[in-house]
Amino acid sequence: MTTINKEEIQKFSNLADEWWDVKGKFKPLHMFNPIRIEYILGKIKQHFNLSGGKNNLLKNFEILDIGCGGGLISEPMARLGANVTGIDASEKNIKVASLHSEKNKLKINYLNKSPEQLNSQKKYDIILS
């Protein structure tokens, strides 16, 4: 059994260069992303009983972002101090995400893998998908 849909991977691979264009095809996602991040942070704060501001809120948290695409969730989590691993089945998405995070001086471990291929002994505090 696999979670990989080859047509979906190809569709997002074809759009890979658009991920960080706020006026491009992912414009609605960029507009929605701040709300999505706030929602995720609210759930994390609630689950882990965290309080305080955002500065280093996620310090020492291990986060796995499954289907990370261009890194639109991975990057904000890393900015908040998390150790982020982003995986995506599209090699092109991983290249775009890696270049963008390097450009922004963020340490994110991006891997071109599916969840089944990850086979990690590492434990994650938070898994996003």
Regions found by a protein language model. Give the residues of each.
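Class I SAM-dependent methyltransferase SAM/SAH-binding core
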Residues: 64, 72-117
